[in-house]
């Protein structure tokens, strides 16, 4: 999965499409979205 090093720095989140895999939970998309891909979110 692609990682976001810009949009999820404080959360150290993983950039991936929904749904997030357990035990990660979706904490986006705004403002923690993955670059230009709104279908991708920040999972942490």
Swiss-Prot record:
Domain of life of the organism encoding this protein: Eukaryota
Keyword tags: Disulfide bond, Nematocyst, Secreted
Subcellular location: Nematocyst; Secreted
Major location (coarse): other
GO cellular component, one term: nematocyst
Disulphide linkage map: 8-42, 15-34, 20-43
Tissue: Expressed in tentacles.
Main function: Peptide with unknown function. Does not exhibit antimicrobial activity against Escherichia coli and Staphylococcus aureus. Does not exhibit any effect on human ion channel TRPV1 in a Xenopus laevis oocytes assay.
Protein name according to UniProt: Peptide Hact-4
Organism: Heliofungia actiniformis (Mushroom coral)
């Amino acid at each position: 999965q692609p990682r976001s090093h810009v949009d999820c720095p404080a959360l150290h989140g993983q950039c991936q499409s929904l749904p997030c895999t357990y035990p990660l939970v979706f904490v986006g998309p705004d403002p923690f979205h993955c670059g230009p891909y709104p279908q991708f979110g920040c999972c942490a």
